[in-house]
Amino acid sequence: MYPPHESFYHGLIKSKLWLCEELETAIYRECISKPSLHILGCWDNLLAFMLLTRKPTFYYEVHGYDINPEAITNANKVCDMWKYESPKVYNHVQDVNNYDYSTCINSIFINCSIDQMDSNNWYNSVPKGRLVCIQTTNMKDPAFPWYIKQTTDSLDELVERFNLSNLIYSGVTNIQYETNGYKRYMIIGRK
């Protein structure tokens, strides 16, 4: 069990705000209208809450996927508003590495949790040409609370790992505190 307020920590919110800003810019630039969002490894799906609060009519629907049933229970509470209002948010208990995304049309795939996943099989199932947004960290701690399984040492390494056919955005943001800090890397582009 994890503290339910953990998804509100400074570094996680800062990273998600950065993602919102850059993803919205990419969607405008690519002239994508009313996309469905698929947030893989969504945890409490605070990202859906943030995206829909910023641009409530921008998206068709949002799907959040997480392997942890407790996280999905929290996600359903965080996104309760969109059970009754549009766009709808659907949260699913699902191992994203064992799901077929090939039928997802006009969809954008977001994964901010690749560092905590055993593999990147999810990426193989995303249809070619779809917009993908991937965010990770240079943290290396496999213990609580980070549970890092896949390390990334640089933005270049992330770009090479996923080899997008059209890289629209790549960047780094620093999360710095008095005694420690880390980097977040993000890429947005067409698979």
Predicted regions and their residues:
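S-adenosyl-L-methionine
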Residues: 1-35, 67-108
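Conserved class I S-adenosyl-L-methionine
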Residues: 32-45
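Conserved acidic residues
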Residues: 35, 104-107, 130
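Conserved SAM-binding loop of SAM-dependent methyltransferases across substrates and taxa
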Residues: 44-58
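Conserved SAM-binding motif I beta-strand of class I
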Residues: 59-66
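A short SAM/SAH-binding and catalytic strip from SAM-dependent methyltransferases
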Residues: 102-120, 138
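C-terminal substrate-binding/active-site "lid" region of AdoMet-derived donor-dependent transferases
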Residues: 118-184
